[in-house]
Regions:
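Glycine-rich beta->alpha junctions and the first turn(s) of the following alpha-helix
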Residues: 177-237
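Glycine-rich phosphate/pyrophosphate-binding beta-alpha loops
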Residues: 116, 143-149, 187, 225-229
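Amphipathic, small/basic residue-rich leader segments at the start of a protein or domain
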Residues: 1-75, 86, 91-95, 99-102, ...
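Flexible, glycine-rich active-site loops centered on histidine and acidic residues
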Residues: 81-87, 109
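A short core secondary-structure module
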Residues: 141-179
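Hydrophobic, small-residue-rich alpha-helical packing segments that form membrane-like cores
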Residues: 116-125, 131-136, 145-147, 159, ...
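Short glycine/proline-enriched turns and hinge-like loops at secondary-structure junctions
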Residues: 49-51, 120-123, 147-152, 189-190, ...
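A short, Trp-centered hydrophobic/proline-enriched beta-strand micro-motif
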Residues: 103-113
Length: 237
């Protein structure tokens, strides 16, 4: 059903990914077939597959370059859903996770920074979060943030006085902007790879993900599974 669509120019958007109208149509069919978000718990409308089940399904769905996003198993949403389900409070899951699982919004992980900030080494992150009157004030710069231009929900990693801390914010909040969409070689994920500037973004403490100072551990948990799922998908190519 999906693989033949790769043969038609009309299936692609200008960034060489599946166009949104076609994607939405296929996603409805995937949901009707009961194969939507298979990596999520049954209690959150998934199939409850563990790593072994995921490996078999992810390999097969990536026989097509369109496959993972059609099943809601593509990066960065895949890893973001995993860590929100594992770390988030129930209130955070309802607000930030469920809309991603349902396919209502996309998400992004804002971690990587230009030099001298944290690139491959998150411990070098310079983006700063300062606590004041129940809110965290964010200032700094990120780049190569996958999917940012199409995302509504963001996980942000910033430096606090006790180490690194993870936060959640919505695209409509003031105090941040996408400076540019960075060109890359080959097809792009929906939302591209973007440079982001934070200038006084305010995040209430209720939208902190996990404990203060535990952000590095949180993203390593998230990235650990993401590295495995990338391999699962690549085997299918």
């Amino acid at each position: 059903k999906i693989i033949p669509l790769e043969s038609y120019n009309s299936s692609y958007d200008k960034h060489e990914n599946i166009n949104e109208d076609l994607l939405n149509q296929i996603r409805l069919e995937v949901k009707a077939a009961g194969l939507w978000s298979p990596q999520m718990p049954k209690t959150r409308s998934g199939l409850g597959l563990g790593p072994i089940g995921m490996s078999a399904l992810y390999e097969e769905m990536n026989r097509s370059i369109f496959g993972p996003v059609c099943f809601n198993c593509a990066a960065p949403d895949d890893g973001n859903m995993y860590i929100l389900n594992k770390i988030g409070t129930e209130e955070q899951k309802v607000k930030w996770l469920d809309p991603i699982i349902n396919g209502d919004v996309r998400s992004s992980l804002a971690m990587t920074e230009p030099a001298p900030g944290g690139g491959s080494d998150p411990s070098m992150i310079k983006t700063e979060a300062v606590y004041s009157n129940g809110k965290w004030i964010i200032n700094g710069l990120k780049w190569y943030i996958t999917g940012a231009a199409a995302a509504s929900h963001f996980i942000l990693l910033a430096k606090t006085k006790d180490g690194l801390t993870a936060f959640l914010y919505h695209k409509d909040q003031p105090g941040w902007k996408i400076k540019r969409r960075i060109p890359i070689m080959g097809p792009e994920e929906h939302g591209g790879h973007c440079e982001i500037e934070y200038n006084g973004l305010e995040i209430p403490d209720e939208n902190r993900l996990g404990e203060v100072g535990k952000g590095l551990k949180i993203v390593q948990i998230r990235l650990g599974l993401a590295r495995l799922t990338h391999c699962m998908r690549w085997i299918g190519l």
